[in-house]
C-alpha cells in the first residue's frame, strides 16, 4: 500500500475535534499515511505538525474579520503555495469556509483532490457560495441530513456522515455522576455557556450573569456552572463576576460534564447548542453580534432559525432570543419554566440524536479513501 499524504486545515476547536477523529479513522484503514496542514492540539496528537497555530484562523463575524484580514489573506496565499509544492493526495478543508473554500478551488485547479468536511451554511445565506463549492470541491461531507439534501439538489457530490458528537455523547447521560464529579449539591443547576471566543463572551458574559441573578429569584435554590474554554475566557468571566454574589462554579473546559450535570442551559448560538441537545438538556439560545454585523446578516440570512436544534427539527423547538430581544429579564423568564420540565424539547432531542448517530469519523474516512481509490 503506497504512502498517502493527506493535507487538512481546521480553523477552530470544533474542527480540531473533527479532524483528529478523521485522522484516526484514516490511519486505521491506511496506516502508511502522512498528515500535513493546520490543526490544533488534538490533530497534532494524531501526527500532524501544524504549519502555524490554528488559533490564528479563529475569528467570527464580518466586522471582526476585517481587523485580521491582511494576516488571513497572507497565510492563505502561503498555504496554497506550500500545498501545491507538497502535492498531497487529498486536501480536506474542515469548516472555516471563508478560509478553506478558496484553498480547495486553487488546489483542485492544480490537480489535487479536494474534500470539504462540514458544510458552510449556504442553505441559510450567501447561497451563491455553492457555485464555488461545486467548482472547487470533489466531495462535500455533511454532518446534518438537511445539508446533504441541499447539495444533491445543487449537483454537488455529497455524503451525509452523521455528527461525531452524536456518536460520542451517550443517548442517556448520568446526571448524578456528573454532579458528583463536579462537587455539585442536590437542587436545580443551570449551565451558563456564553461561547468560546473572546468576542462572544464579551457580548454575552455579563448578560448571562445578569440573567442568572434574576433566575435566583425565579428558581429557589438554583446553582450555576459556567465552563470556560481556556484561561483567557476564565479571566474574562472572573472580571465580570467582581461585585456579584452568585452561587456559581467556574470550570476549566469540562463543558460536557457541565451539560450532563445541569437541568437546563442558557447558551450562545453555535455548536454548543448541538451538544446541549445531545445531552437532552432544555435550553434557551441567545446571541448578540456587533450591530453592523447583525444588520448585514439580518438582510442576508434565508433561514428562519439560527440554532442547530431548530434547524434540525425544522421548527422553533427551542427559544431563540437574538440581539435586542436578548435581555436578562427575557432570558430568565424564558428559561425558568424549563428547569422543572423541559420535556417538550427533550423528547424531540432524543429522536434527532438517533438520526445523527452514524459513526461519522469512519463514514468520513471511507468516503475520503473511496475518492482516492482511482488515484
Swiss-Prot record:
Catalytic activities: a lipid X + a UDP-2-N,3-O-bis[(3R)-3-hydroxyacyl]-alpha-D-glucosamine = a lipid A disaccharide + UDP + H(+)
Membrane found in the keyword field: no
Keyword annotations from UniProtKB, A to Z: Glycosyltransferase, Lipid A biosynthesis, Lipid biosynthesis, Lipid metabolism, Transferase
Associated pathway: Bacterial outer membrane biogenesis; LPS lipid A biosynthesis
GO biological process: lipid A biosynthetic process
GO terms of molecular function: lipid-A-disaccharide synthase activity; phospholipid binding
InterPro entries tied to this protein: Glyco_trans_19
EC number(s) stated in the UniProt entry for this protein: 2.4.1.182
GO cellular component: membrane
Protein function: Condensation of UDP-2,3-diacylglucosamine and 2,3-diacylglucosamine-1-phosphate to form lipid A disaccharide, a precursor of lipid A, a phosphorylated glycolipid that anchors the lipopolysaccharide to the outer membrane of the cell.
Similarity comment text for this entry: Belongs to the LpxB family.
NCBIfam families given in the database record: lpxB
Protein name: Lipid-A-disaccharide synthase
Species classification: Bacteria, Pseudomonadati, Pseudomonadota, Gammaproteobacteria, Pseudomonadales
Amino acid at each position: 500500500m503506497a504512502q498517502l499524504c493527506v493535507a487538512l486545515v481546521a480553523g477552530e476547536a470544533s474542527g480540531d475535534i473533527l479532524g483528529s477523529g478523521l485522522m484516526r479513522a484514516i490511519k486505521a484503514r491506511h496506516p502508511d499515511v502522512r498528515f500535513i496542514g493546520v490543526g490544533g492540539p488534538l490533530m497534532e496528537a494524531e501526527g500532524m505538525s501544524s504549519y502555524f497555530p490554528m488559533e490564528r484562523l479563529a475569528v467570527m463575524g464580518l466586522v471582526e474579520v476585517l481587523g485580521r484580514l491582511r494576516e488571513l489573506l497572507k497565510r492563505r496565499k502561503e498555504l496554497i503555495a506550500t500545498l501545491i509544492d507538497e502535492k498531497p493526495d487529498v486536501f480536506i478543508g474542515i469548516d472555516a469556509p471563508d478560509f478553506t473554500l478558496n484553498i480547495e478551488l486553487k488546489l483542485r485547479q492544480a490537480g489535487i483532490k479536494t474534500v470539504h468536511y462540514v458544510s458552510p451554511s449556504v442553505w441559510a445565506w450567501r447561497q451563491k457560495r455553492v457555485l464555488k463549492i461545486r467548482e472547487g470541491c470533489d466531495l462535500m461531507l455533511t454532518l446534518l441530513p438537511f445539508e446533504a439534501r441541499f447539495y444533491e439538489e445543487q449537483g454537488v457530490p455529497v455524503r451525509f456522515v452523521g455528527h461525531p458528537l452524536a456518536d460520542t455523547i451517550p443517548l442517556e447521560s448520568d446526571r448524578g455522576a456528573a454532579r458528583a464529579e463536579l462537587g455539585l449539591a442536590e437542587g436545580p443547576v443551570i449551565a451558563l455557556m456564553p461561547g468560546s471566543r473572546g468576542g462572544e463572551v464579551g457580548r454575552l458574559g455579563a448578560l448571562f450573569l445578569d440573567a442568572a441573578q434574576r433566575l435566583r429569584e425565579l428558581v429557589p435554590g438554583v446553582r450555576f456552572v459556567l465552563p470556560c474554554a481556556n484561561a483567557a475566557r476564565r479571566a474574562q468571566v472572573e472580571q465580570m463576576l467582581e461585585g456579584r454574589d452568585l452561587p456559581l462554579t467556574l470550570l476549566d473546559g469540562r463543558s460536557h460534564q457541565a451539560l450532563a450535570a445541569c437541568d437546563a442551559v442558557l447558551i450562545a448560538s453555535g455548536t454548543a447548542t448541538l451538544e446541549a441537545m445531545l445531552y437532552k438538556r432544555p435550553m434557551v439560545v441567545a446571541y448578540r453580534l456587533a450591530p453592523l454585523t447583525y444588520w448585514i446578516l439580518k438582510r442576508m440570512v434565508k433561514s428562519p432559525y439560527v440554532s442547530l436544534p431548530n434547524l434540525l427539527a425544522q421548527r422553533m423547538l427551542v427559544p431563540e432570543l437574538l440581539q435586542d430581544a436578548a435581555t436578562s429579564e427575557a432570558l430568565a423568564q424564558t428559561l425558568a419554566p424549563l428547569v422543572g420540565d423541559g420535556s417538550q424539547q427533550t423528547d424531540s432531542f432524543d429522536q434527532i440524536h438517533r438520526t445523527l448517530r452514524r459513526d461519522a469519523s469512519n463514514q468520513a474516512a471511507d468516503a475520503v479513501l473511496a475518492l482516492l481509490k482511482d488515484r
